[in-house]
C-alpha cells in the first residue's frame, strides 16, 4: 500500500507523517517512511542539487532531476516494499510534479504526464492526503511570524522556497485542480486546524477505506 502526503512547504506534512508513522509502529503494522526527492544514495545527492539555493536550474532540468530521483526511489525501494506487503508512507510523489513543475513552472502537461509515467513505472497511490494552506500562512508558519510583512533571511530558504509567493499561489491552485480531478483518491485537510484533529481525520479516513487499519486506536 502506498500512502502519499502533499502540500506546499509549511503545510505540516512532516508533523502528520511522524504521527502516522508512530501510530503504525505501535499497531505493529509493517511500514516505511520515505521522502521525495531522496530515499536512495543517488536520490539524496540529486536532492542536494535541487534544493541548494546556489544552483540555478532550468524548469526542464528541474523536472528531469526530480524525475530521476523518483525513478530511483520507486524502482529500488517503493516497489520492493509494496511487493513485500509493507505500507509505504511517502512525503510527496508525482502530484508535486504536476503542481510545482506543471502549474508553477508552466511546463507542458502532456510532456509532464509522459515523464511521470516513466519515472513512477505507472505506480499510483492508494490514498493521498493534501494539507491545504495559503502561501502567506505557510511562510508565516515557517518563520513563526504572527503577521505580514514578514522579515526573514532569504538564505534560510532552499532553492524551491525562494520561488516567491506568486509561484506558490500557482502551485496551490494546481493542487486544488488535481484534487478536483481525483476526488476519490484525495483527502483534503485544512492545514490550519489543530494538528491532533488533522491526525484523527487521517486515521479515520484510513480506517474507513482499508480494513488493515480497522484496529488502530487514537487517543
Curated annotation (Swiss-Prot):
CDD domains: TMPK. GO terms for molecular function: ATP binding; dTMP kinase activity. It comes from the Bacteria. GO terms for cellular component: cytosol. It is an enzyme of class 2 (transferase). Belongs to the thymidylate kinase family. This is Thymidylate kinase. The gene is tmk.
Amino acid at each position: 500500500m502506498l500512502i502519499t502526503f502533499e502540500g506546499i512547504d509549511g503545510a505540516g506534512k512532516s508533523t502528520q507523517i511522524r504521527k502516522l508513522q508512530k501510530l503504525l509502529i505501535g499497531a505493529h503494522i509493517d511500514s516505511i517512511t520515505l521522502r521525495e526527492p531522496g530515499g536512495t544514495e543517488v536520490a539524496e545527492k540529486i536532492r542536494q542539487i535541487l534544493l541548494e539555493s546556489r544552483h540555478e536550474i532550468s524548469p526542464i532540468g528541474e523536472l528531469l532531476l526530480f524525475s530521476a530521483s523518483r525513478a530511483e526511489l520507486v524502482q529500488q525501494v517503493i516497489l520492493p516494499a509494496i511487493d513485500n506487503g509493507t505500507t509505504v508512507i511517502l512525503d510527496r510523489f508525482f502530484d508535486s510534479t504536476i503542481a510545482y513543475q506543471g502549474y508553477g513552472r508552466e511546463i507542458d502537461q502532456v510532456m509532464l504526464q509522459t515523464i511521470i509515467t516513466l519515472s513512477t513505472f505507472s505506480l499510483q497511490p492508494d490514498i493521498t492526503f493534501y494539507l491545504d494552506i495559503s502561501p502567506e500562512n505557510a511562510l508565516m508558519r515557517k518563520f513563526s511570524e504572527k503577521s505580514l510583512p514578514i522579515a526573514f533571511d532569504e538564505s534560510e530558504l532552499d532553492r524551491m522556497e525562494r520561488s516567491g509567493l506568486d509561484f506558490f499561489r500557482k502551485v496551490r491552485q494546481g493542487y486544488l485542480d488535481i484534487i478536483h480531478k481525483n476526488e476519490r483518491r484525495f483527502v483534503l485537510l485544512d492545514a490550519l486546524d489543530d494538528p491532533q484533529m488533522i491526525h484523527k481525520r487521517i486515521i479515520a479516513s484510513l480506517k474507513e477505506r482499508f480494513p488493515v487499519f480497522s484496529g488502530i486506536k487514537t487517543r
